[in-house]
């Protein structure tokens, strides 16, 4: 009887603690996708909207992926008549606000891909925040045409 009681207690404890340790609160990802890559190309980009419903300011400091050696936050900016991409070390998302990673603006650059990303696959992204909390999301890989169609639905 004590083994059954201890097992139930452990299960209840895990159910209570698991949500606290695996996500950053009420962060919502929408319109997310990663661009498919042709053979021989070792980088791609991810686009999504990240909504902060936590009631607290969140500062995104890093992103990692199961498919890329490195994920960098970038911002495209016009410098005169040339578009330039610059690295961003952190992004602040106010309570109740959303942040858009989208073509032509901020985006997530996935580099060091060992294999091409094929439409229909999924890519796991793990967001790390300044307070040490994390949030994981699995995004679909879309070909360029499907990704453009999805952007039109935003």
Task: State where each predicted segment sits.
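Bacterial N-terminal signal peptides that target proteins for export
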Residues: 1-10
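Bacterial N-terminal signal peptides
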Residues: 9-19
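Sec/Tat signal peptide C-region and signal peptidase I cleavage site
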Residues: 20-24
